[in-house]
Amino acid sequence: MLFAEFAEFCERLEKISSTLELTARIAAFLQKIEDERDLYDVVLFITGKVYPPWDERELGVGIGLLYEALENVSGVKRSEIESMIREYGDLGLVAEQLIKKKKMTTLAFEELTVRKVRETFDEIASLTGEGSMKRKIMLLTGLYGLATPLEARYLTRLILNEMRLGVGEGIMRDAIARAFRADPETVERAYMITNDLGRVAVVAKKEGEEGLRKMKIEIHIPVRMMLAQVAESLESAVREMRTAAVEWKFDGSRVQVHWDGSRVTIYSRRLENVTNALPDIVEEIKKSVKPGVILDGEVIAVKEGKPMPFQHVLRRFRRKHDVAKMVEKIPLEAHFFDILYHDGECIDLPLRERRKLLESAVNESEKIKLAKQIVTDSVDEVRKMYDEAISAGHEGVMIKLPSSPYIPGKRGKNWLKVKAIMETLDLVVVGGEWGEGKRSHWLSSFELACLDPVTGKLLKVGRVATGFTEEDLEELTEMFRPLIVSQQGKKVEFIPKYVFEVAYQEIQKSPKYESGYALRFPRFVRLRDDKDVDEADTIERVENLYKLQFEVKRQ
């Protein structure tokens, strides 16, 4: 497929606001794609992805490299490109204008194809070490040299993972279902166990719904993790379930462990491979866990038998060098509470049976443990378990329905959580503002947004400026500086990449923001770099928490 055909289709999508029309247009486009490799790439590219989230490959191309490539191909200086970004607010549109100027004097000698873009991306992702940056710039310059102005717009946005089409996972799922006459729920399940929409589309095209139903969980391909809803209270949660399985809720990082007898891989909640950062846990898994399993659990940092704050776990996850030193400095424990695979898929079994399989697969050790669990219909026993968890330094309890299956990616009432502190929100940072006085060289406030999971759009809910130390602001400024795509006065706009956990006094209705809601007195709690943008809290959750405030007040 010519990349021009893809770009022209994206331009048409950009003008459509109706979810139903977007779904129908994408479905019709997918039906026409004959080459399976093109189909795979187009599905990912439309959703702004180059690789599935669990794939360790990444382009490693920041705005700085794009500036250099665009400067090379257009002859326009970087300072002028930055000025154009302030005018257009979108590097994709800037690239389009730059290539438009260039193409007035240059004849294209080769047409760009989707395959060529994919092959170049794969080569860029493979580059490491000395000279890799120069080679990346050369390859990017080559792509822009072949691109038409419109192709340059969407090529740039794709590299930045921000297509601006309003097409989220939900729309693409429904489009695949419509294109290849499959049940959307079957497509959803296939996606949740593979986390690869491109692969799902190819199977749907080749084998139809029957092929999708045959797709099974595979060791070393992460499964989207099941999530919990917030319970109104311990009492209401137990009442709703009648009999409940109750476990401690840990203040750590969610992990999914895959162990086939020869290799262990560990994935974070964002489905990133964090195996190399956790060599101590890997070795203990090999000693304490039977092979042929996928386990769901939480890793916590411990000191003298007490849990340490969540940030310590993240320091372990982030560490790329001197890992052995960090193992000594921040010891970890893994607490497992579920099993997804035991010599075959077992997510459709009820929790009570999965727990038995889990117990048979894990021999507890100093670092590998089973989450403590009781099954009861007594509110008093649940309260006692909750108090024990808080006394031990944990967050609260998880209350689960013993008869429930494990539904990948699902947040529902089969799992409920009760925490000691007021519920917080995990929100995407989409903008910021430079400070004043001695803080003028730091970003001092950050604009926050929740996720519309259907369209993939980020809906603003407010701005946070409190809860930061000076060290926080210095570190966050360095993190966000490369992500700035436009600036008006002191206000800047970021490529969405990071998630903040934010506390607040209450949620209010507000016409000021596209979400329709605003946070009152928001306060920064911590950076959630264990969460991807797609894992941020949704507009539905904001609405539910807004309504829950009134339920609590009535009580």
From Swiss-Prot:
EC assignment: 6.5.1.1
Residues at the active site: K249
Alphabetical GO biological process terms: cell division; DNA biosynthetic process; DNA recombination; DNA repair; lagging strand elongation
GO molecular function: ATP binding; DNA binding; DNA ligase (ATP) activity; metal ion binding
Reactions it catalyzes: ATP + (deoxyribonucleotide)n-3'-hydroxyl + 5'-phospho-(deoxyribonucleotide)m = (deoxyribonucleotide)n+m + AMP + diphosphate
Keywords associated with the record: ATP-binding, Cell cycle, Cell division, DNA damage, DNA recombination, DNA repair, DNA replication, Ligase, Magnesium, Metal-binding, Nucleotide-binding
Superkingdom of origin organism: Archaea
Needed cofactors: Mg(2+)
Residues reported in the UniProt entry to bind ATP: E247, R254, R269, E298, F337, R411, K417
Membership in a protein family: Belongs to the ATP-dependent DNA ligase family.
Summary of the function given for this chain in its UniProt record: DNA ligase that seals nicks in double-stranded DNA during DNA replication, DNA recombination and DNA repair.
Full protein name: DNA ligase
